[in-house]
Amino acid sequence: MTSTHPGVTAGAALVLGGGAMAALLGVGPGLVERHLVPLLGAGASDAAVETLFVVAIFGTIAALAILGGTLSGVRTLAAGGAPARNAGIGGAIGLGGIGIAISYAAIAGVVRSGEGSGAVLALLAGALVVLLQVAAEELYFRGLLQPVVARAWGNGAAIGLVSVLFALLHLLGGALSPVSLINLVLGGVLFGWLAARSGGIAAPIAAHFAWNGSEQLIFGLDPNPGVGPFGSVLDLDLAGAARWGGSAEGLNASVGMMIALLVVLVPLLIAARPTPEVARA
């Protein structure tokens, strides 16, 4: 595959990579529910079922990313330069972004206090599950597809194309509103920029984990309303105008999230452009 023209390889990566992910997300959950969930027994907790789904689906995504990297000559698992430092920066960006989005929701008057809570061990287990989920997504999109496309068409095109694919595939996960899709594209651009700038996946994984993990396990904003199977430190619900997060999609479909992403992303794009070479095996 490495001897093929880079443009052909890039196009094939987008088509085959998108198709494989769509097929997995389309049929995988049903297969897990029919064949694996019964193995847990009738009394299995929601947290156990959620863990099984994430391990089965996102473990497969991670394996596909690593296999694809081996076939294409891309170091999918490359952490990038100064991984601890870049992970810290990524985590701070993720926490800052979600904080801005929540602030806009609070200003709009849609934030409500719920009644959920979570035990420490459950929250730690939930953190590991969220980490696996976001790490698998970053391995696939920013660790594999983005570098392959960047070889042919450069970092800018790669970040944009992979971000659009990232957003479209989330349609299979329930992201239905136009605002939600725009936010997913912007989030993909943010994670893609971090990957390209740092030369690896440590920074985007940390940013993605900080954003999703705090939204679910610290603030209890996903799902909305209520809390997930692992509980949350706080339980904030969003009720009111959908444009500020008052829908079932919560912050992900809010204008506040869009503003937060732009506040974080625009200065980064203005400050510097991604420069490192694509990592090769």
Task: State the predicted function of each range.
Residues 17-25, 49-57, 89-93, 129, ...:
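Alpha-helical transmembrane segments of multi-pass integral membrane proteins
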Residues 28-50, 70-139, 146-151:
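Juxtamembrane helix-loop-helix connectors linking adjacent transmembrane helices
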